Regions:
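Intracellular coupling helices
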Residues: 21-28
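N-terminal single-pass transmembrane signal-anchor helix
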Residues: 1-21
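Short, well-structured segments within or immediately adjacent to enzyme catalytic domains
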Residues: 29-289
């Protein structure tokens, strides 16, 4: 009889405990993202009002030392322990990665895109909102003649996270790691800087996952109905991790805005007059869209 009563009480308490745990993880994630957001203005001050790019790669694609990402550039501002030598070379050991790069609810298994054992595989749950990706000598985005950077007035150019990517066939391409001046963001309080972005190959220092291209990047567009999410081919367990993280956060993602504040929002609250596949609103630096 006593055992039965205890079992009933446990069954009643477990959902409440699970809900409390999820809320605690969501709040911890927000606090971590707030700390990450504080690293950006310090970087800007130290770099002549320039924001960091989301990432750049030198075209060799050999491990280690081929790419630098926003979290590498912010390492010393956000509690990392990587040496200047490692950071300037483009990689750092997993033990030197800031712990705040991993959302506490993001406990999904990761695999190295390099394959095999990877001492540089540290967890990262976040990405900058994309401004586009350059490839080869001329790049696949149109540059603004005023600054040589992606033209943010064009469709598909959302945030300030530039990915300077040189393909292996263009190892000596016209390549740089410039970022935008912070003044290009005309609506800092209404423009997302960092978003949650997890899947099977999301890891610190990985250029391929350093930028997010809108809601469709957050585990495709299936977070609103996680049960409809397709399998993630980049995950070693075949699970769409973005959809699961959205569900773990009670159908919300956390976002850092360009003014440094953090909000937890449903995806449909972020897209303004756009759509899930062509977002506007908080995904762009343009006010009022």
């Amino acid at each position: 009889m006593v055992i039965a009563i205890i079992a009933i009480l446990a069954a009643m308490l477990l959902p409440a405990l699970a809900s409390a745990k999820a809320r605690a993880q969501r709040m911890q994630c927000m606090n971590q993202m707030r700390q990450l957001g504080l690293g950006f203005p310090i970087f800007v001050i130290d770099h002549n009002d320039m924001l960091p790019p989301a990432g750049w790669a030198d075209g060799t694609y050999t491990q280690p030392h081929f790419a630098v990402t926003w979290d590498s550039l912010l390492n010393k501002y956000i509690g990392g322990n990587a040496s200047d030598v490692d950071l300037s070379a483009g990689s750092y050991l997993s033990g030197d990665a800031p712990k705040i790069l991993q959302c506490p609810a993001d406990r999904f298994p990761k695999v190295s895109w390099m394959g095999g054992s990877d001492p540089y595989l540290a967890m990262r749950s976040y990405a900058m909102v994309s401004a586009g990706t350059s490839q080869g000598p001329t790049g696949d985005f149109q540059r603004d003649p005023k600054n040589g950077l992606p033209n943010l007035n064009l469709a598909g150019k959302l945030g300030v996270g530039i990915v300077w990517q040189v393909l292996a066939q263009y190892p000596v391409a016209n390549f740089d790691a410039s970022g935008y001046k912070s003044s290009v963001v005309r609506d800092p309080a209404g423009s997302i800087l960092l978003c949650e972005n997890t899947h099977g190959q999301q890891s610190a220092g990985n250029i391929w996952t350093s930028a997010c291209f809108g809601p469709q990047s957050l585990g495709d567009i299936y977070q609103i109905d996680p049960s409809a999410a397709p399998q993630d081919p980049n995950s070693n367990n075949g699970v769409n991790q973005g959809a699961l993280l959205y569900k773990a956060h009670k159908n919300r993602f956390n976002y850092v805005f360009n003014d440094g504040h953090v909000e937890g929002l449903k995806i449909e609250q972020t897209i303004g007059s756009g759509t899930l596949t062509a977002p506007k609103g908080m995904w762009t630096v343009v006010p009022g869209d």
